Amino acid sequence: MFNIISKKYTQALVDSGSNLDETLSILKGLSLALKDKRNADIIASPFLSKTQKEQFLLESVGKVDMKLQNFFRLLAQSDRILLIPYISDELERRLLARKKEYAATLTAKESLDTKTLEKIQDSLAKKLGVKLSIKQRLSEVDGIKLSVEDLGIEVSFSKERFSNDLKHHILKAL
C-alpha cells in the first residue's frame, strides 16, 4: 500500500524538475532520521497539529528550494511524512534505472566475502549489460537467493529443495 502511494509522490518529484540527486540525499537523510523512534513518534503523535509537524519537517531539512519546501508541506498536510523512506527508495530506484544501474539483493544463511560478491556482481552485470550493486541480507533459510527486483530477475537455490528433488528423481529411476 505504501509503495503504491509513494510512487505517486515520487512521480511528482520527478516531474517537478528539481535536482533529483540533491533531493534524494535530503530524503535519505530524513529517512535515517525517521528510523529514530523518537522522531517517528513525534511525527505520528496525535497531539501535534499538522502545522507543527510541517514546521518540524522543514526545520529538519534546512534550506531547500521552494518546490521541495512545497513538497514537504504537502506531505505534512496530507499526513504522509512517514512515507518519506518509501519515496526515497523509489526515487533511488528510478535514478539508478535512468543510469542503467540496478541494485540486487543476495540473501544467504552466511555472509559471503567481498571477493565472492564482486565475482557474482561482475558476472551478472556483464551478462545483463548493466551496472549492478549487490546488497547482502542474512536469512535463516539454508540456501541462497539473488534477486534484481527492478529487472524482474530472481534466482534461488535451496538445499532442502535440491535434496527433495534428488530423492524424488532417484525413486522415480528405480
Swiss-Prot record:
One GO cellular component term: proton-transporting ATP synthase complex
Signal sequence extent: none
Keyword Cell membrane assigned: yes
Any one Pfam family match given in the protein's UniProt record, by short name: OSCP
Keyword field: ATP synthesis, Cell inner membrane, Cell membrane, CF(1), Hydrogen ion transport, Ion transport, Membrane, Transport
Membrane topology label: Peripheral membrane protein
Cross-referenced Gene3D superfamilies: N-terminal domain of the delta subunit of the F1F0-ATP synthase
Main subcellular localisation: membrane
Keyword flag Magnesium: no
Top-level division of the source organism's lineage: Bacteria
GO MF annotations in UniProt: proton-transporting ATP synthase activity, rotational mechanism
Compartment annotation: Cell inner membrane
Function of the molecule: F(1)F(0) ATP synthase produces ATP from ADP in the presence of a proton or sodium gradient. F-type ATPases consist of two structural domains, F(1) containing the extramembraneous catalytic core and F(0) containing the membrane proton channel, linked together by a central stalk and a peripheral stalk. During catalysis, ATP synthesis in the catalytic domain of F(1) is coupled via a rotary mechanism of the central stalk subunits to proton translocation. This protein is part of the stalk that links CF(0) to CF(1). It either transmits conformational changes from CF(0) to CF(1) or is implicated in proton conduction.
NCBIfam families in alphabetical order: PRK08474.1
Quaternary context: F-type ATPases have 2 components, F(1) - the catalytic core - and F(0) - the membrane proton channel. F(1) has five subunits: alpha(3), beta(3), gamma(1), delta(1), epsilon(1). F(0) has three main subunits: a(1), b(2) and c(10-14). The alpha and beta chains form an alternating ring which encloses part of the gamma chain. F(1) is attached to F(0) by a central stalk formed by the gamma and epsilon chains, while a peripheral stalk is formed by the delta and b chains.
Family, as annotated: Belongs to the ATPase delta chain family.
Protein's name according to its UniProt entry: ATP synthase subunit delta
Organism the protein comes from: Helicobacter hepaticus (strain ATCC 51449 / 3B1)
Gene: atpH
